């Protein structure tokens, strides 16, 4: 099943931030969001709320059409990851991934994001750790200057 605009937990015009309520019927759904320059994928639902609130502020309203955010739990299978890369991430300039745990926590997704970035060096991949113990190892695989 392909989801483009399903019942989101968090709603902003045209679902720029997407968080699908966690029920079993959604576990294999394919996710698509409109293209944007900036993509934020996170393990933390509260991050989505913060971004949503930020985009509601008048001085950041212009960013609404250029940022997408998604909870990582919506990208569990290889098919979901591949589809999201093809339909949404391929059009981005910057992807920020915030993950709890090490690279193995979302290994296939990280591998595909690294391939996405390697294909075009102008693209930027920022990987943030949700825990201090993985901060260095995840930052090292980001494509931004570490200094």
What annotation goes with each model-predicted range?
Residues 2-147:
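An N-terminal assembly and electron-transfer interface module characteristic of large anaerobic redox
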């Amino acid at each position: 099943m392909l989801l483009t605009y399903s019942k989101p937990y968090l709603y902003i015009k045209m679902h720029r931030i997407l968080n699908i309520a966690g029920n079993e019927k959604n576990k294999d759904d394919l996710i698509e969001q409109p293209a944007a320059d900036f993509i934020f994928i996170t393990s933390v639902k509260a991050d989505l709320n913060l971004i949503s609130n930020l985009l509601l502020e008048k001085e950041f309203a212009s960013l609404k059409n250029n940022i997408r955010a998604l909870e990582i739990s919506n990208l569990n299978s290889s098919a979901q990851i591949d589809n999201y890369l093809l339909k949404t991430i391929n059009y981005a300039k910057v992807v920020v991934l915030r993950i709890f745990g090490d690279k193995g926590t979302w290994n296939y997704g990280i591998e595909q994001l690294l391939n996405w970035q390697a294909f075009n060096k102008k693209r930027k991949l920022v990987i943030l750790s949700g825990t201090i113990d993985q901060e260095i190892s995840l930052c090292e695989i980001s494509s931004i200057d570490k200094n």
